[in-house]
Amino acid sequence: MRRLFALILVICLSFSFAPPAKALGADLTPCAENPAFQALAKNARNTTADPQSGQKRFERYSQALCGPEGYPHLIVDGRLDRAGDFLIPSILFLYIAGWIGWVGRAYLQAIKKDSDTEQKEIQLDLGIALPIIATGFAWPAAAVKELLSGELTAKDSEITVSPR
């Protein structure tokens, strides 16, 4: 009975799923050709002291793809022709976040040897922090080095296991 139920379940599930529909921005048009975007561009407000800032902003947006409402949309599906919209900034964000994390980790390891560790966590010791920050740009190479040498990960004997 269990096998029959499992077989029926597998058959029903395999026929009930529809393949995912991929629109890939089918309703998006270049903003420069979009009438709704052109109407928005005519009423562009300046956001800085530059009297041309609104016009310049809409000139940059005209290179993007707009929806029927006239607003630019980000294409984040991995196509390389739109890498500058999302892929490059996201990789840069991950690099900077990794730099901050790596430098923070190295600073905490460096001050662990001192007697006033808690105070140095609250008020940074710039004599220790600045050289670490300066070398933090190479954090991907340092992370690979520490991973291969075993410094980055804890040994199995150091990891506690819950008695449950």
UniProtKB/Swiss-Prot annotation:
<dbReference type="GO" id="GO:0031676">
    <property type="term" value="C:plasma membrane-derived thylakoid membrane"/>
</dbReference>
<comment type="subunit">
    <text>The cyanobacterial PSI reaction center is composed of one copy each of PsaA,B,C,D,E,F,I,J,K,L,M and X, and forms dimeric and tetrameric complexes.</text>
</comment>
<feature type="transmembrane region" description="Helical">
    <location>
        <begin position="83"/>
        <end position="103"/>
    </location>
</feature>
<keyword id="KW-1133">Transmembrane helix</keyword>
<keyword id="KW-0732">Signal</keyword>
<dbReference type="GO" id="GO:0009538">
    <property type="term" value="C:photosystem I reaction center"/>
</dbReference>
<comment type="similarity">
    <text>Belongs to the PsaF family.</text>
</comment>
<keyword id="KW-0602">Photosynthesis</keyword>
<keyword id="KW-0603">Photosystem I</keyword>
<keyword id="KW-0793">Thylakoid</keyword>
<dbReference type="Pfam" id="PF02507">
    <property type="entry name" value="PSI_PsaF"/>
</dbReference>
<dbReference type="InterPro" id="IPR036577">
    <property type="entry name" value="PSI_PsaF_sf"/>
</dbReference>
<protein>
    <recommendedName>
        <fullName>Photosystem I reaction center subunit III</fullName>
    </recommendedName>
</protein>
<dbReference type="InterPro" id="IPR003666">
    <property type="entry name" value="PSI_PsaF"/>
</dbReference>
<feature type="signal peptide">
    <location>
        <begin position="1"/>
        <end position="23"/>
    </location>
</feature>
<feature type="transmembrane region" description="Helical">
    <location>
        <begin position="124"/>
        <end position="144"/>
    </location>
</feature>
<dbReference type="GO" id="GO:0015979">
    <property type="term" value="P:photosynthesis"/>
</dbReference>
<keyword id="KW-0812">Transmembrane</keyword>
<keyword id="KW-0472">Membrane</keyword>
<comment type="function">
    <text>Probably participates in efficiency of electron transfer from plastocyanin to P700 (or cytochrome c553 in algae and cyanobacteria). This plastocyanin-docking protein contributes to the specific association of plastocyanin to PSI.</text>
</comment>
